[in-house]
């Protein structure tokens, strides 16, 4: 247990529980470094194996990478399960990693460690997210720009969470990715296209769409207004 706890401290996770029992539950914001932490754990200690309910890693020469969760776990290994909040039932494993804000599931468990600092996007995005009710921090700099949906062309990777918006984009010949297609993905520049002026229909979906970028987030919405409801 010490090896994973030491890594959590290394990656600046905050400990909430004095007594740790299995499963160790770790919650963090997008870009906190949980995938990097898990990969480092696999390289450090062969007793561990890792699975994800999201997008699996590419195979590695070591033969030990974050694989897609199939519901089966090997004997004699300490199993780490990433993106556990995407599941409806949580298996008995050694450690669980996830972001309950990105999920509407009832499977969320009480956290032993948390991290609210993102290394992916920057302080401008975090300022917007805090205004919308999400506690996310960053020491990086980035750009956020909110524009009217009909007056500005999208930049970078275009994403959406509402089906009618996807239909509108396709009708105009705009290549765009749905919520399901961006899970586990990161892009330099993202344009989030929405019919809303605040995240009401599906807050978790809007949160995911606004946390996929590294350097710039553009939001295209009616009247160039996107604020808390």
Curated annotation (Swiss-Prot):
InterPro entries: (+)RNA_virus_helicase_core_dom (IPR027351). One of its GO terms (molecular function) is ATP binding. GO terms for cellular component: host cell cytoplasm. Its main location: host cell. GO terms for biological process: symbiont-mediated suppression of host innate immune response; transport of virus in host, cell to cell. The keyword GTP-binding does not apply. Pfam families: Viral_helicase1. Residues 133-229 form the (+)RNA virus helicase C-terminal domain. Keywords: Host cytoplasm, Host-virus interaction, Inhibition of host innate immune response by virus, RNA-binding, Suppressor of RNA silencing, Transport, Viral immunoevasion, Viral movement protein. Residues 1-132 form the (+)RNA virus helicase ATP-binding domain. It is found in: Host cytoplasm. Belongs to the Tymovirales TGBp1 protein family. Homodimer and homooligomer. Interacts with capsid protein. Interacts with host AGO1; this interaction targets the host protein for degradation, thereby suppressing the antiviral RNA silencing. Transports viral genome to neighboring plant cells directly through plasmosdesmata, without any budding. The movement protein allows efficient cell to cell propagation, by bypassing the host cell wall barrier. Increases plasmodesma size exclusion limit. Acts as a suppressor of RNA-mediated gene silencing, also known as post-transcriptional gene silencing (PTGS), a mechanism of plant viral defense that limits the accumulation of viral RNAs. TGBp1, TGBp2 and TGBp3 seem to act together for cell-to-cell propagation. TGBp1 is the main movement protein that physically cross the plasmodesma with the viral genome. TGBp2 and TGBp3 would facilitate TGBp1 function. This is Movement and silencing protein TGBp1.
């Amino acid at each position: 247990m010490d090896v994973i706890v030491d890594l959590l401290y290394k990656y600046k996770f905050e400990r909430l529980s004095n007594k740790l029992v299995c499963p160790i539950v770790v919650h963090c914001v997008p870009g906190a470094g949980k995938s990097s932490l898990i990969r480092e754990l696999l390289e450090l200690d062969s007793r561990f194996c890792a699975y994800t309910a999201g997008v699996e890693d590419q195979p590695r020469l070591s033969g030990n990478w974050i694989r897609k969760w199939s519901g089966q776990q090997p004997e004699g290994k300490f199993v780490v399960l990433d993106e556990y909040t995407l599941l409806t039932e949580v298996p008995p494993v050694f450690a669980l990693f996830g972001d309950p804000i990105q999920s509407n599931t009832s499977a969320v468990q009480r956290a032993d460690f948390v991290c609210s600092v993102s290394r992916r996007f920057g302080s401008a995005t975090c300022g917007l997210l805090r205004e919308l009710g999400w506690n996310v921090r960053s020491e990086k700099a980035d750009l956020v720009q909110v524009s009217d949906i009909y007056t500005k062309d999208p930049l970078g990777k275009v994403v959406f969470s509402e089906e009618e918006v996807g239909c509108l984009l396709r009708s105009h010949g705009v290549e765009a990715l749905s919520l399901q297609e961006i899970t586990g993905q990161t892009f330099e520049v993202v344009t989030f296209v929405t019919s809303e002026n605040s995240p009401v229909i599906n807050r978790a979906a809007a949160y995911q769409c606004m946390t996929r970028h590294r350097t710039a987030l553009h939001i295209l919405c009616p009247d160039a207004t996107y604020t808390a409801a």
